[in-house]
Amino acid sequence: MDSGQPWFPKIHTKEVRRRLSSLNIATPSSSPCNMNWQSLEPKHIINDNVYGTVKVPRPIDKLIDTVEFQRLRHLKQTGLVYLVYPNCEHSRFVHSLGTFSLAYALVDKLRHSQPSLNITESDLICTSVAALLHDVGHGPFSHLFDGEFAKRNGSRFKHEDMSILIIKKIMNKPEIKSEFACILGETDEEYAKSVTLITELISGKPFDFQDMDGFKDLPADVREETVKNEWAIIGCGPEKSFLFDVVSNSYNGHDVDKMDYLLRDSKASGVGITFSESTLERLFNHVRVVIDPNSGLKRIAYSIKCIGDLKAIGDSRQELHSKVYQHKAVRFMETLMVDALINAGDFLKYKGSNGELYSLKNVTEDVDAFLKTTDYVEQEILNSQITDPKMIEAQTALLKIQRREIGCKLGYFEMNPENATQLKGNCNNQTGAAEVVKKVGQKMKEILEQMDDTEEMDGKLKDIQFTVMHSVLGRGLDDKTHPIERQIFYDGKPSEHEGKQVVGFYPSEDYVINNCPRMATKWEIFVMGDRSLRKEPLLADRVKRALQLAGESEKFLTPRKRSPQDSPDEVSSSCSTAKRRLEFGSS
């Protein structure tokens, strides 16, 4: 390896590659501040279509060569999206490699630019391992398995919980432990603490106490004492709190996991977003650790000049959810796939650690059994010789997907979650949106029956089969909070603060009012019908009209009254800022 070559992931465009060389991230083995470090020179160099190459040092390569990690090759990153966007066939394997490369580069940059942080070799490796293994707990078809399938199966399974179990299994293998012990801890106690930190970097939420009522109003000394008392992380102390902003940032969502999948999924689907490779490069050029003005903890911050670049992360997430992840055809095919998995779930068996067989429905009860499941479950169902009616029904559902016998979108409307006030507290989550779908579907049936009688349609409208569905399009946090509101910034350039302890700040209220929507989440309610309705435009139009009337009747959708010459887009655009200012002023 050329010792003069910087060790960091290179973005695949030539211009950005050239500019990235200015980051001055030195090769780990040549760092003057860590002369006693074990050499972490790349063991493998893997081609990557987003970053050009991903360089994997020893002993990280040993984790990649485990059966648990290799399983990710057989899990598509975006589930069934490839059925609409054919190039989205990339796997959790490549996403995990990309997330690792960003995490390593970010922590290594902070280590060189801010030696006072005392980032150790163990800190770097723990963060890198957490990034590499953060998705090993995903089931078949990724989020479909721990989403709608788990819900209909009556399970509370979350892939993060399974990831923790699998990580512990991997890291405690004798051959893995012997490779990592010299870095993570020679004694069993030290090693176990490091493994705990790895899992906490994925699932830990060390900053939740900041949301306690009145926390920000406490005197500084009381807040400092509260932080010490509320720090619930076992793997490290509050002095390394900034590490929890890297892989899985539960506070604002601006982490390398999201950065990688936004770039990778956008590139694969061909759907453009505002977050780009040059945005990533700019952020890495302006990152540093500062003091959180609210908690006094050390947090990752960016120059205030990058506020638009950070805002693009949440906005791009919503864009991809709208156009890619929750595409209407994808959502309909997901319903068919879940039908198939539920019906075939009792017949598909996987051997667990004790030799016992677990069905697909309870496979999450045993780690070894779970690790035998992949996206290949679809072929297991299609190739099954079982003649039980449920298995035949499952095969029929999958054949509908293959033959493209799926519904077509007849109409939709967007709604503000706040309009679902009558749902008694369920309006700000998936449950609330599902309740809206239920109410709208019932109302549509009534309206279509009335239309059928009024227009003398001879029962055609009454007999129409349709499905009302929903999409929750968020920016990564709750319905009202834009992630940028919870991001810490600093003034100037990183070089201006070398050797100094900087107190950061949050975006001003004026910026939030003028640049962020009042609601960070929107719901899309849409109706899918048989494709034959495309040949019956009159019937399709009536279904679309019924959806609109049902939304207005249930007060989920506000009826619009305007003169013919009014442009609804212009009216909405001109009034939105003033309306938001009034609402903030009255609060």
Curated annotation (Swiss-Prot):
<dbReference type="InterPro" id="IPR050135">
    <property type="entry name" value="dGTPase-like"/>
</dbReference>
<keyword id="KW-0597">Phosphoprotein</keyword>
<keyword id="KW-0547">Nucleotide-binding</keyword>
<keyword id="KW-0479">Metal-binding</keyword>
<dbReference type="GO" id="GO:0106375">
    <property type="term" value="F:deoxynucleoside triphosphate hydrolase activity"/>
</dbReference>
<dbReference type="Pfam" id="PF01966">
    <property type="entry name" value="HD"/>
</dbReference>
<dbReference type="GO" id="GO:0006203">
    <property type="term" value="P:dGTP catabolic process"/>
</dbReference>
<keyword id="KW-0378">Hydrolase</keyword>
<feature type="binding site">
    <location>
        <position position="134"/>
    </location>
    <ligand>
        <name>Zn(2+)</name>
    </ligand>
</feature>
<dbReference type="GO" id="GO:0008832">
    <property type="term" value="F:dGTPase activity"/>
</dbReference>
<protein>
    <recommendedName>
        <fullName>Deoxynucleoside triphosphate triphosphohydrolase sahd-1</fullName>
        <ecNumber>3.1.5.-</ecNumber>
    </recommendedName>
</protein>
<dbReference type="GO" id="GO:0005694">
    <property type="term" value="C:chromosome"/>
</dbReference>
<keyword id="KW-0342">GTP-binding</keyword>
<keyword id="KW-0862">Zinc</keyword>
<keyword id="KW-0021">Allosteric enzyme</keyword>
<dbReference type="GO" id="GO:0009264">
    <property type="term" value="P:deoxyribonucleotide catabolic process"/>
</dbReference>
<feature type="binding site">
    <location>
        <position position="95"/>
    </location>
    <ligand>
        <name>Zn(2+)</name>
    </ligand>
</feature>
<keyword id="KW-0158">Chromosome</keyword>
<dbReference type="GO" id="GO:0042803">
    <property type="term" value="F:protein homodimerization activity"/>
</dbReference>
<dbReference type="InterPro" id="IPR003607">
    <property type="entry name" value="HD/PDEase_dom"/>
</dbReference>
<feature type="domain" description="HD">
    <location>
        <begin position="92"/>
        <end position="262"/>
    </location>
</feature>
<comment type="function">
    <text>Has deoxynucleoside triphosphate (dNTPase) activity. dNTPase activity acts as a regulator of DNA precursor pools by regulating dNTP pools. Phosphorylation acts as a switch to control dNTPase-dependent and -independent functions.</text>
</comment>
<feature type="binding site">
    <location>
        <position position="135"/>
    </location>
    <ligand>
        <name>Zn(2+)</name>
    </ligand>
</feature>
<comment type="subunit">
    <text>Homodimer. Homotetramer; in dGTP-bound form.</text>
</comment>
<dbReference type="GO" id="GO:0005525">
    <property type="term" value="F:GTP binding"/>
</dbReference>
<keyword id="KW-0539">Nucleus</keyword>
<feature type="binding site">
    <location>
        <position position="257"/>
    </location>
    <ligand>
        <name>Zn(2+)</name>
    </ligand>
</feature>
<dbReference type="GO" id="GO:0046872">
    <property type="term" value="F:metal ion binding"/>
</dbReference>
<comment type="similarity">
    <text>Belongs to the SAMHD1 family.</text>
</comment>
<feature type="modified residue" description="Phosphothreonine">
    <location>
        <position position="558"/>
    </location>
</feature>
<dbReference type="InterPro" id="IPR006674">
    <property type="entry name" value="HD_domain"/>
</dbReference>
<dbReference type="GO" id="GO:0005634">
    <property type="term" value="C:nucleus"/>
</dbReference>
<feature type="region of interest" description="Disordered">
    <location>
        <begin position="554"/>
        <end position="587"/>
    </location>
</feature>
